[in-house]
Amino acid sequence: MKLLFNLEYQTTFGEELMLNILTHGVGAESPSASANNVEGPKQSNGDVVARHKMSTADGLHWSCQLTIAEKDCSCIDYYYTLVRGDQELRHEWLVAPHRLELAANKGARYTIYDHWNDIPEDSYMYSSAFTECVAARRCNQSVATDYDRTVRIKVRASQLRSNERLAMLGSTEALGCWEALGARTMTEHSCNEWVISLNADVLPDTFEFKFVVLDEENDVTPVWENGMNRTICLPPMEKGEVVVYELPQAWFPVYPWKGAGTVIPVFSLRSEGSFGVGDFGDLKLMIDWCDKTRQRILQVLPINDTTNTHTWQDSYPYNAISIYALHPQFCDFRQMPAIKDEAIRNHYEQLRLELNALPQIDYERVYDAKMGYLRQLFQQEWGSVSRRESYKLFFEQNKEWLLPYAAFSYYRDLYGTAVFGEWPEEATLAAATEHPSAKAKKEMQFWYFVQYYLDMQMHDAHNYARQHRVILKGDIPIGISRDGVEAWVEPKYFNLNGQAGAPPDPLPLEMNACLPGCVWNATPRSLSPLERNIGFWTQA
């Protein structure tokens, strides 16, 4: 099977275009382009990029022909880059690469006409807040066709809601002769990109058409796209030929999406079933309220662990000791196994009722009570939890931050302070993780146990929000705690002698957050999650 990619892009002397094929998964084969095949980089998600040089006769019209085995793959994702020698000058928007589906059963030669895709003005519509929540729709592969000659039309349309779909209406009988009832429904084969296959044998050489939006739930008049009719002039086509047109984005006369929402700290969501403080179970109740009041955004204040002094001062949510770990106070005991010992269970139930009846949250009593409950559960459940496949997967995926966090928490409680500069020299990460004492190992396992349940409950609340089409929006501090895990493990990235905050504004107020600043000229070497994050922000 032959694939001929075409792109119009004006270049200057010395510049070249490259076609970059993404091969998903280990061992995937890349299409062959003989001597023009160049080894490319590996993406952060594990995809391998195979680069192919394109050719041109005028510096404007670029093309590249590839050959693949007919059963090698069902679709190809790719993007274009502009290079000068070994230097990459720019590349397309990588969030939504081009997708070519090999959906024509009789297709032996594909001719693809693309256009360069920069970051669109509505790029936010490609975020998970829309594609997986507010405007979530199921993407599907195109149905295979048996046409002798096939025309495939692709277009991006990001304004559609979850109950809407894209269709084509045109001047030919195959496209409904401009009658709404004859509109041809398209397939969303990737987020916000729609495609349709047409039988070229029943199409005239030139035809006009427009894209329309259909409502799947209500029988209403289709919404027609803005602008003049689109026109396609088909080239001569032989049997087995497929021509693919990627068209400019479709825009419709609809208002931009707007959503109302609420900002709230999770600890304030105390309900009748709480344990003296709002938790991740109560977060679901708040999501229900947002949905019933037609709010689409729920922003929560930071939910990271702030346990520093074991006093009420730890209630400040913007001084987290870890940028990853969640606060133990948000554990919902209703979603965890019950304590089997009846006397202990009744004790904590009475304590729960007492703490829940307080007019204000007693941070210290609630924290101590919930930690005592969690330690009882740990003694009871750790043996079975540690053997679960879900726990093993959680630990493997998060051990880069989980081990330092557990070690830090162990030392903090052992020495009675989170100021790691006051710990003895032997209190190192290596000592706690490589050759721990029995006590240290048990204590660190407790923190693994707590974070495992917190992770499950937070994921459950997040999925619940998506099911109700409520965007669960987070909040983060402006920096790390000077007495936290990151400062302890990787101090080279932080100015621990400085303090960051907010400068005065027109109201001549300022705020000293007492957080250390970042050392931005430290070279990230991708040796840890924090270093990768710094690399991302400095390169963004």
Regions found by a protein language model. Give the residues of each.
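Compositionally biased low-complexity segments at domain edges in trafficked proteins
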Residues: 107-149, 158-161, 238-270
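Non-catalytic scaffold segments within catalytic domains of secreted glycoside hydrolases
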Residues: 443, 476-479, 483-539
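Structured loops at beta-to-helix junctions and adjacent beta-edge loops in soluble globular domains
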Residues: 8, 22, 156, 171, ...
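Aromatic-rich carbohydrate-binding modules that target alpha-glucans
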Residues: 10-74, 83-105, 157-204, 214-237, ...
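A short, amphipathic beta-strand motif
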Residues: 2-8, 150-156
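Extended acidic/polar, glycine-enriched regions
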Residues: 226-254, 281-282, 297, 306
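Acidic/aromatic-lined carbohydrate-recognition and catalytic surfaces
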Residues: 253-491, 527-530
